[in-house]
Curated annotation (Swiss-Prot):
Keyword Amino-acid biosynthesis belongs to the record: yes
Function noted in UniProt: This protein is involved in the attenuation mechanism for the control of the expression of the his operon structural genes.
Family stated for the protein in its record: Belongs to the HisL family.
Keywords: Amino-acid biosynthesis, Histidine biosynthesis, Leader peptide
GO BP annotations, alphabetical order: L-histidine biosynthetic process
Protein name (record): his operon leader peptide
Length: 16
């Protein structure tokens, strides 16, 4: 799995 995909798939509960 690509690191970028992982970050994309990661659940972040903070506003961008």
């Amino acid at each position: 799995m690509n690191s970028v995909q992982f970050k994309n798939h990661h659940h972040h509960h903070h506003p961008d």
